[in-house]
A protein has these predicted regions:
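The catalytic-center signature of Zn2+-dependent metalloproteases
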Residues: 335-353, 416-472
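Bacterial N-terminal signal peptides that target proteins for export
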Residues: 1-9
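Sec-exported extracytoplasmic/periplasmic mature domains
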Residues: 316-327, 355, 427-428, 432, ...
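Auxiliary tRNA-acceptor-end handling modules of aminoacyl-tRNA synthetases
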Residues: 23-303, 321, 335-388, 393-410, ...
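Soluble non-cytosolic domains of exported or imported proteins
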Residues: 89, 268, 301, 305-313, ...
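Zn2+-dependent metallopeptidase catalytic core
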Residues: 59-61, 304-330
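Conserved catalytic/binding loops enriched for acidic/polar residues
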Residues: 441-834
Length: 834
């Protein structure tokens, strides 16, 4: 038996050893004629065959050959703002594990949202197995190296739709249903790069459709076959020298949330780290010391010189914040070196991106999801924004001021806005959230959305000297100190952070992030977008004065020599609606509720309604924006607003203009309806009305919903000063009733809101009919029609017939594609891949 056993072992060895040598031979055969690049993982590039082979390390006991952070983006994009597939777009990063399963290599996205911090491996495994894993790709193993390395063809991994391009096209109503064409998709072998801590890949993705839609047709050479360049980075996991900082909602930081199922019963399962770069002092024993490795940003060398200089200047403002946090000379901004790939993870890049129309700017980047450590910043700035800003200021100041270099030079004001924009978007990548209350603190943060601060001077002219601020604000320094300050050993960091934030609150600084700042119906009285001033009501009065001066002077001076006069139809929009965002800000005083983000033990816990006298002042200011005299334009202006020529791909027509039903003649009534609808929508937002009702329940002396309705009714159903203004007043009456009917039919409105609104409409119907008996015949007809609409609304069965009047299409103020933030022409945001 022993002899037979020896014979069997000999035969097995004879079979296995040649197989091992054959695998090594396969490796040599596969790679012998290919270009080898040594790096984080070795690459073998097959230029003729269009393949990229990767040598992965020998698998561990769990079969994992490589664990890395993956970032995915677009080297070349679609160019459509609404769809958002821009050059430079990138996701926030994820950890991918390449695992050997049988004879295949499988790529798995690890789920770090759910984790266990315990040392017990079985506890960690229990959490890991409780939530679905994601296998995203598998490929054949081509060969095995002498030390167990595995040779894999990664070409199909690189050409899969890793960024969700098909979904983005499908989800947009003007995108279309596309399929990924395998024949027309391939890796860009020449673009593959290998470095010690990362490898970088580009691939051409071609998506085809038999029924492309308008947004793709407007930007692609052939909308039936759209080719984008997808970029994938694989990055070495950071070492263990980074110390995460727990997120504090009071700090102005950005959170990286997760669930830790190892948390004790006395703790919270839901937790979060603050997102930030790694900074370590050269000398940690002193309060202020340069960092061992500074943070360096690089500006796209493809930006025009004056833009590039403005971007560098604005982004450089953050050096002051880092100095305040104890890191002098630890942050700088330079021009991207020639030949550097903007999506290479070694570079924090500010990209200047071109699109068909103006659009949003983004500040995001690559984050280690395990710790919140920021590894690469990625800022996208749209090139058409600055041109839109210049046009707006030419509408306010006159195009004759362009190029003068004076304080009212539209180009210089627009460049000031670009500096602010660069600082804002870089701020997001550094870990700072929006602070939409900063405008109420003397522009205390670049993380607000800044409206231009323009005044009517004593001479009656517009003063642009303070249009945009320079440098970071006081809140930015506080937030940077909380996020980046490195404390001496033995310091209670939580207590030190609390002391810093409490001192900031004591000085009057406020912080309010997106959920309570963006929406028109939100409650915080000092948190809005594109507003100005510590007193939003006083600021609205100032803005209305600026608007009046600009409209009184509006004419051909708003155009540069040689521009078509029809362009005035585009310029008039932001001037006529110049008050739109300050209206929203003032409306937040009505039914407003002041509060701070706080923790138990803080001195400033709780909230309180806005004092009733301030609410009444806001109501009066808002109702004044409905004055027909404020919404009318003189004939000399109206007759200059001739229609544009519709040219190449519809250029000259579309969303940037007021809608209208009068053909070539400018439709003033629709413009007035548009402006009035902004005010009425803000006043009668379902959330605001619900708060008014609740506040009155708690305090009978509060401003009530009925008070608001009565003041608006008195303004809209009184006598017009002139027959000319009567037409505007009638259109506003229609919009008012329509808004109330829509409010009562809104499924998100509270029962109290619906009940009180319907009761008011019933009474209003009786009042306007009784008044109309002595009125102008046109007034009689309009009021009878309004009464019929109200009766039809009250009598109709469920579901309601809405809308009760056609909606007016409001030209975009925010960059096109704004979505929830719509409601600026001076804008920016981070739609962040966060």
């Amino acid at each position: 038996m022993r002899g037979m056993k020896s014979l069997v072992l000999t035969l097995v060895a004879a079979l296995v050893l040649p197989l091992a040598w054959a695998q090594s031979g396969d490796w040599a055969e596969e790679t012998g004629a290919l270009t080898h690049k040594d790096g984080f993982v070795d690459l073998y590039l097959d230029a003729e065959g269009g393949r990229i082979l990767v040598a992965l390390p020998a698998p561990d006991e769990e079969g994992v050959a490589l664990r890395a952070i993956q970032a995915t983006g677009l080297t070349a994009g679609l160019g459509s703002n609404p769809i958002g597939l821009d050059r430079g777009l990138a996701n926030g990063g994820e950890i991918v594990a390449f695992r050997k399963v049988g004879d295949k290599m499988v790529a798995e996205i690890e789920n770090w949202t759910y984790r266990a911090s315990a040392d017990n491996p079985l506890e960690r495994k229990a959490v890991r197995d409780s939530f679905a894993r994601s296998f995203i790709w598998s490929g054949e193993i081509l060969g095995t190296g002498p030390d167990g390395e595995l040779l894999v063809d990664m070409s199909s991994y690189l050409t899969r739709d890793a960024l969700g391009v098909r979904a983005a096209l499908k989800e947009h109503p003007k995108g279309g249903v596309y399929q990924l064409s395998d024949d027309l998709s391939m890796p860009d072998v020449a673009a593959a790069l290998a470095f010690p801590d990362n490898v970088e890949f580009d691939a051409f993705l071609t998506l085809t459709s038999d029924e492309p839609k308008s947004e793709v047709s407007a930007t692609a050479a052939d909308a039936r076959s759209v080719t984008l360049a997808q970029h994938i980075s694989l990055v070495r996991l950071p070492d263990e020298g980074y110390t995460p900082r727990l997120f504090d909602p009071r700090s102005g930081a950005i959170d990286v949330g997760f669930y830790d199922f190892s948390a004790p019963l006395s703790g919270q399962v839901g937790q979060a780290f603050a997102r930030r770069f790694r900074l370590e002092k050269q000398d940690p024993s002193v309060a202020s010391s340069p960092a061992k490795e500074p943070i360096v940003f690089y500006v796209d060398s493809g930006a025009p010189a004056e833009i590039r200089d403005a971007l560098i200047e604005g982004a450089s403002w953050w050096a002051e914040a880092f100095a305040a946090a104890g890191f002098p000379d630890s942050y700088r901004v330079e021009v991207l070196p020639d030949g550097a790939h903007p999506l290479d993870v070694r570079y924090n890049v500010i990209q200047w991106v071109h699109r068909q129309t103006r659009g949003w700017s983004y500040g995001g980047g690559l984050t280690d999801p395990r710790t919140g450590e920021m590894l690469k910043a990625n800022v996208i700035l749209g090139s058409q924004r600055v041109r839109q800003d210049r046009m707006i200021f030419e509408g306010l100041a006159g195009a004759s001021k362009t190029g003068t270099g004076a304080a009212d030079d539209p180009v210089q004001i627009a460049l000031s806005r670009i500096r602010q924009l660069a600082a804002h978007e870089v701020g997001h990548t550094l870990g700072f959230a929006h602070n939409f209350a900063a405008s109420s603190n003397d522009r205390a943060s670049v993380m607000d959305y800044p409206a231009p601060l323009v005044w009517v001077g004593q001479d009656g002219n517009l003063d642009f000297s303070t249009a945009y601020d320079t440098g970071i604000g006081e809140w930015d320094k506080v937030s940077a100190m909380w996020l980046y300050r490195q404390y001496p050993n033995g310091t209670d960091e939580d207590a030190a952070g609390d002391e810093l934030l409490e001192s900031a609150w004591a000085s009057g600084l406020r912080f309010v992030d997106d959920p309570q700042g963006r929406g028109v119906g939100t409650a915080h009285p000092y948190s809005s977008v594109w507003d100005n001033g510590a007193d939003p009501v006083a600021a609205l009065l100032d803005v209305m004065r600026v608007r009046k001066v600009a409209l009184d002077r509006f004419g051909l001076d708003a155009l540069q020599t040689g521009e078509p006069t029809s362009r005035l139809r585009a310029v008039i929009v932001p001037v006529y609606l110049y008050h739109r965002y300050q209206v929203n800000a003032a409306a937040k005083m009505i039914g407003g509720y002041d509060f701070h983000y706080a923790e138990a033990g803080d001195a400033n816990v709780g909230g309180s309604p806005v004092p009733v006298d301030q609410q009444r002042g806001a109501l009066s200011a808002l109702v004044a924006t409905l004055d027909p005299a404020a919404l009318d334009l003189p004939d000399r202006t109206l007759d200059l607003l001739t229609p544009p020529l519709v040219t190449f791909r519809g250029a000259g027509a579309g969303a940037e203009y007021f809608a209208g039903e009068t053909g070539a003649m400018f439709d003033l009534l629709t413009a007035a309806d548009t402006a009035a609808s902004q005010t009425l929508a803000a006043l009668l937002h379902p959330e605001r009305v619900a708060r008014l009702i609740e506040t009155e329940r708690r305090n009978r002396n509060a401003l009530s919903y009925g008070d608001v309705l009565r003041e608006v009714e008195d303004a809209l159903f009184g006598e017009a000063e002139t027959p000319r203004q009567a037409g505007i007043l009638r259109r506003e009456q229609m919009r008012y009733v329509s808004t109330l009917i829509d409010l009562a039919a809104n499924t998100e409105a509270t029962p109290e809101t619906v009940t009180q609104t319907n009761a008011y409409l019933s009474a209003l119907s009786r009042r306007i009919v009784s008044r109309s008996r002595r009125a102008d015949p046109v007034d009689v007809a309009v009021r009878d029609e309004l009464s019929r609409r109200i009766t039809a609304h009250l009598d109709r069965p469920s579901p309601p017939l809405v809308p009760s009047a056609p909606d007016v299409e409001i030209p975009p103020g925010s960059p096109i594609g704004a979505g929830s933030a719509e409601a600026c022409w001076h804008c920016d945001t981070t739609l962040l891949p966060r």
